[in-house]
Amino acid sequence: MREAKRAAARRGRRLRIMFVDEARFGRMNRIRPCWAPIGTRPEVAAQLIREYIYLYGAVSPKDGICVYLIMPTSNTACFQVFLEVLARKFARQDILLVLDGAPNHRCSDLAVPNNITLLYLPPYSPELNPKENLWDEIREKVFKNYALKSMDAVRAKLKQAILYIERNPKLVRSITSFPYIVNSL
């Protein structure tokens, strides 16, 4: 991280620290607890249709800014597109991108844009990535107990989730500002 800060300073640019991850969303819903009147048992439709799309996301815990991209799958080509979107969105800044060691994040075919530096988390440590908490928030607040009839409905729900997160930077900061992150900034 120190090297990334020095490199950004040499180039006269601001360093933005972001955490990235991807999550799978689809028609196979997970039933979650919910409130119901006393004496009644809530009914929730369930289905076992295995169709999925992926939501790539990056979060800046310092200011709560997020970037999302809906993709058909999770592979190196999709991750490459996401990196290019990030690089363009923050073209005047350097980005230290903290991520897990998934194979599509480490592929030799991956061309990392000039303003992005990758920093890998230790293996098997999703608890260190605050982006994971945002996936929980999306699943709890937007996808809770829905049986979606089509992949278009899943996409529409994802767009609703993106708007919910992007409109609430204060919430994002409260979910993602882990002490070890805030103290290092």
Q: Language-model segments: what does each one mean?
A:
Residues M1-L185:
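Short functional hotspots at interaction and active-site rims
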